[in-house]
Design a protein with these regions (language model features):
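Conserved, well-folded catalytic cores of nucleic-acid-processing
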Residues: 20, 24, 123-126, 130, ...
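Catalytic NTP-binding/metal-coordinating core of nucleotidyl cyclase/transferase enzymes
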Residues: 34-118
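A structural signal for short, well-ordered beta-strand segments
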Residues: 47, 97, 144-150, 221
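Alpha-helical scaffold within the catalytic cores of cyclic-nucleotide enzymes
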Residues: 72-86, 103, 107-146, 171-180
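Catalytic strand-loop-helix junctions within cyclic-nucleotide turnover domains
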Residues: 100-111, 146-166, 183-186
Length: 235
């Protein structure tokens, strides 16, 4: 009995560590043996990519403690919102974050899109609250851009024989990161594709078709209606 309890405790500890460092989905896959290079599965998902504004310039002038505090506040806002909405954070990349919201059985596409958008908005609101505390403490406020798309991705292990990474790859992943790069020049905190916008009602508004690096045709983009409408009224 003692050995069984020890094994159960070991598995709980391993699951906690894997979930913390890899995310719930990848942690579950690795714990259940999906650790070979090339292990993969295809899935339809909403892809979310976020990036902290002006990180490079700030990193050059902030102390290490200031930088870590900023990243912690930014990532905490995103991770909490994404997790509550049923998403999976897959990767932190400096000041970037990649997450997916897997689409379940037929009929759940619209709900998944709505949850992903709600997560992005909730993260924005959470960071606004954190910014009030930062400003009160004499620290600079933080802003981030986020992009959303829907597409089929490959979810699994990639890398070399001695080092693997559990992640998602595919055209939709590349597209969403390039769309996010347009948030700042377009003056929008959030941008989404038509593939996602059609499932969230009037929460998003069109902001035109824009050139995306690597694509031959412009891509129709949508932004938060609550942000677009006041901007148009004041134009």
């Amino acid at each position: 009995m003692g050995l069984v309890l020890d094994l159960l405790e070991w598995r709980r500890t391993a699951r906690t560590l894997l979930d913390t460092y890899l995310g719930r989905g990848p942690g579950h896959e690795v714990l259940n043996g999906a650790i070979r290079r090339g292990d993969r599965r295809d899935l339809e998902a909403v892809i979310l990519f976020a990036d902290l504004r002006d990180y490079t310039a700030s990193a050059a002038s902030w102390s290490v403690d200031q930088l870590l505090a900023a990243l912690d506040a930014y990532y905490q806002a995103l991770v909490d919102a994404i997790t509550v909405a049923g998403g999976e954070v897959l990767k932190f990349m400096g000041d970037g974050l990649l997450a997916v919201f897997p689409i379940g059985p037929p009929g759940t596409l619209a709900l998944t899109c709505q949850r992903a958008l709600a997560a992005a908005v909730a993260a924005r609101n959470a960071l606004a609250a954190a910014n009030r505390a930062r400003i009160a403490a004499g620290a600079a406020p933080l802003e981030f851009g986020v992009a959303l798309d829907v597409g089929r991705v490959v979810y699994g292990n990639i890398g070399g024989q001695g080092r693997l990474d559990f992640t998602v790859i595919g055209p939709a992943v590349n597209l969403v990161s390039r769309i996010e790069a347009l948030c700042k020049p377009l003056g929008q905190p959030l941008l989404a594709t038509a593939a996602l916008a059609r499932h969230v009602g009037d929460e998003l508004a069109p902001v035109g078709a824009h050139r995306i690096r690597g694509l031959a045709e412009p891509v129709e983009l949508f932004a938060l209606a609550a942000v677009v409408a006041p901007a148009r009224c004041s134009a």
